[in-house]
Amino acid sequence: MAPRGAGFVVMAALLAAAAAPQMASRAAPALDYEFFKARVRPIFLQKRDGHTRCYVCHAESNNAFWLERLSPGASTWSEEQSRRNFQMASILVNPGDPATSRLLQQPLAPEAGGNVFHSGGRQFASKDDPNWKILADWVNGQKL
């Protein structure tokens, strides 16, 4: 005769097995370095009308988000610098959830759902901005 709790254990195991595919589909996507390097990294260096480049305020700053300083004469980062920037940017995102990722909320206008506490410029007037969408794609696990 099985112990009294055996039925509960079997039922719990069956429920866990049934939920496993759903739980797996909700797993956070991995952030892709190659997508970051090709599509996200240029955004940090890009001059936008009426705004300074992200790089200007965030190069080795005391901000929560800092970027590597460009080497003298360089127009972009080295591989090593890019990997450090990737790690730094990754800290400020919740993979799979652009709406709660600081990297996307800080430069977004408050009227569009951005964080009102960002002291820097509002790079994106809305979530329809092509560069905001690129950042969101990266956070959602987009790959090249």
Predicted stretch roles:
Residues M1-P3:
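N-terminal secretory signal peptides that target proteins for export/translocation
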Residues G5-V10, A99:
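Residues at the start of alpha-helices and the adjacent loop-to-helix junctions
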Residues F8-A18:
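Bacterial N-terminal signal peptides
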Residues A19-L144:
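Aromatic- and Gly/Pro-enriched helix-to-coil junctions and flexible linker segments
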